[in-house]
Amino acid sequence: DNYGECCAMAEALEDVNNQRRAIEAELSDIAKEQASRIYHGQRALVVAGEGWHEGVKGIVASRLVNTYGVPALLFTIDGDEARGSGRSVGNVNLFEAVESISYLTKRFGGHGAAVGVTIPTKNLKAFAQRLDAYMQKLEKMARDLGVQDIVVT
């Protein structure tokens, strides 16, 4: 019976979606707690942790962007490798920002508003510092030129 199959599939989909929501909520709480400890006005935010679920990093990064108003990247640490997902804010091209420090990455891809990045775990701190420095430089250039629509806010 197709109706019975459809109902069973819909129920299974609902269960999986509820599991995803629970994982997302848990990671969001952990990431927000970490961000509240490390954020001191940086123009980009990088958070990382071991065993963080790969499938919800982008959503959680978006929440950090909404909270802090700066580009945010969320990394899952797996041994000597960290895999991240980032989201930008406004007209800030996050892809170009990551490209400018690509020597710290193993690989990266994406577009102006969102990126995926893999880096050696040992480079996490330098990556966060250099990304912040890039964003500060971008903001200063925009101010100096009087270009309001690319200011990182």
What is the predicted function of each stretch?
Residues D149-T153:
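Short, conserved secondary-structure transition motifs
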Residues D1-D132, K137, A142, G146-V147:
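Hydrophobic helix-and-loop "lid/oligomerization" segment in the mid-to-C-terminal part
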